[in-house]
Amino acid sequence: MDQWLEEIRAALPELVVYQQEPMKKHTTFRVGGPADLYVCPKKQELPVILGLAKKKGLAVTVIGNGSNLLVGDKGIRGLVIEVGAQMNAVEVQGNILRAQAGALLSQVATKAAAAGLGGMEFAAGIPGSMGGAVTMNAGAYGGEMKDVIRQVTVLTPECEQKVLSREELDLSYRHSCISKNHFLVLEAELSLTPAPEQEIRAKMAELREKRVEKQPLEYPSAGSTFKRPEGYFAGKLIMDAGLRGYAVGDAQVSEKHCGFVINRGNATAAEILQLMKDVQERVKKQSGVTLEPEVKMIGEF
């Protein structure tokens, strides 16, 4: 690790490398132990960082806005790369919008609206970035990334850039081919539909109101904790199992929306994980349905 640090500082003197960086600062759950090494690079720095990490046998974890993650209390070994503020450019040409992987979905939706382009209204309130949204085919209120993606540029494990069409991405409910192939999303190109800006903004405002009314936005969470089982709603199954408000330490099933697990203050990853397991067991016993986590678990628990 020290050798990697030495070499990366020589190769990229302007890159800031954080050591023992608390991951709770970088996840919307506000939990997670320290990352051994943490960087937030520019696009052109990525091949150098990844190449050196591979050469030194350093484990690499890539995150975006940290909005769909549960990081273990013992943190993450090796190197964490945040694709974020240094990679968030958004540009519009005609009905095509290009967004770098670190661009926030709210930023992308606002830019699309300003250009009179519809199709991203559903994403305005999703607290994620473009890279994560593509990776998990994020969606809400009847829309999903699959509807608007034209193509995506990724970095392969061999540090080669590759362009994937929508078909090649193999998009389905909360799934794409990105994770299993260990690709890193660099940029997404979206094909949007011209529409009056006023109509687009009205739709965005309507969906924002729904979120505020129905979701526990006042507490740290990772959004929907479980995937929607075929033919059911996770929140309804959890409520029917008598788990509204159920808590383990400072982790709690939201009383406002049972599909959300919230951090009431100082929850640990262990408490959240235990609560999720309890919910899965009770729901399985009550309804026979197996709930699958939508939240991605990384690091050491």
Predicted features, each with a name:
Residues 2-130:
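Anion-binding (especially nucleotide phosphate/pyrophosphate-binding) glycine-rich loop
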Residues 34-35, 66-70, 74-77, 104, ...:
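Gly/Ser/Thr-rich beta-alpha loop segments that engage phosphate groups in nucleotides
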